[in-house]
Amino acid sequence: SRGLGDVYKRQALARPQHVEDKTFRTVNGIDIMIAFDLSYSMETPDMVLNRMPINRLVAAKHVITQFVDSRPDDRIGIVGFAGKTKSFCPLTLDHALVNSIIRDFHPRMIQADGTAIGSAIAAAATRLDDRKNTKSKIIILVTDGASNSGQISPLVAAENAAKLGIKIYTIAVGTEEGTLANGMVVQSEFDEPTLRKIAQLTGGEHFRATNMASFNKAFTSIGKLEKSEAKVQTVRHIEEYFMYFLVTGAALALLGLSLQVLKPAPAP
């Protein structure tokens, strides 16, 4: 027992231990409100996907749902607008819900026709202003027309958003030539100077999406400009085992000593 006790003592002196590293990832996500044009002109079929003509709304759904999927750490919300504005989804990390809402979009969801860009910016900014502790807040405005409705002008709404620290990225969708829809040539009344000014006032950027390639490129560019901040921390946990060996060794040594003491003396 004493010999075995010495073995355990030597093991204790070697300081056996178990080392485990745990990595923790902390992400400071961005709050993103997407202002989605649902006016009737979004049904203009002047975009092409997989060699098939599609309308602007279908193109927007395709590109935006992909963008949502690419931002797992960001809270995303949706406002839709035509002649009026409607909030469809508050800021959420439930991106399956966001994309489900987007896929159900159609122009007749908002009965008032027109393009209320200022009201859409104001509604989106109100949602973002509720999030006081978020480091980065942005609005992505997707539209195919000039503002012709609403209670507030686009530039005033943009100035108010800028005061709240909100950046606005504007995307003009569609071709100036338009295309045939229901036997009629449909053209868009783009107001790109205003869209550029909205972006400029808030520190954002303006993009023009005349086809699927440029539409995708716009959202890719926004994704590169607006990155979530991730911090990775590694914590090392060390569990010492020497005490187990030391106690066991001491116990065995004591047992060996006790056995020697209790061992009967040899017969004379």
Summary of predicted features, one role per range:
Residues 2-8:
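Short, small-residue-biased leader/transition segments that mark boundaries at the very start
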Residues 12-27, 262-267:
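Aromatic-capped interface at the extracytoplasmic side
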Residues 22-29, 42-75, 92-99:
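…and closely analogous acidic/polar surface helices at protein-protein or active-site interfaces
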Residues 31-41, 75-80, 99-101, 138-142, ...:
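Soluble periplasmic/extracytoplasmic beta-strand elements of cell-envelope proteins
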Residues 36, 42-45, 84-118, 198-201:
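Short, charged loop segments at secondary-structure junctions
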Residues 72-105, 125-130, 179-196, 218-221:
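Short beta-strand-loop
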Residues 112-115, 137-138, 145-201, 219:
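VWA/integrin I-like adhesion module and closely mimicked acidic/polar interface patches used
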Residues 207-268:
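C-terminal "exit" segments of structured domains
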